[in-house]
Amino acid sequence: FPNPFNPSTQIYFHALERSQIDLKIFSLNGDLIKSYPAKYFDIGTNFIEWNGLNDKYNSVPSGVYVYKIQSMNHIMFGKMTLLK
């Protein structure tokens, strides 16, 4: 949230149990753009902020991106749009 966003967005998710969460952001053609190290989150609503940079700290172009949030028992996908 927000979507579309510029320059950053918060990706919200709800953890049903304390668990390790892994977040990856991809371009629409499947290229890995940003990978966040797995981290433990508490039960409830949490978020991870993405600043529109890739793993090399370069700004990514405007476009639609897909995120994948994975815990031990769940996988969630979502889309977000970066408008510059």
Q: Language-model segments: which ranges?
A:
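Glycine-centered coil/turn sites that cap beta-strands in beta-rich domains
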Residues: 1-27, 35-38, 47-50, 71
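Generic structural signal for well-ordered beta-strand positions
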Residues: 33-34, 60
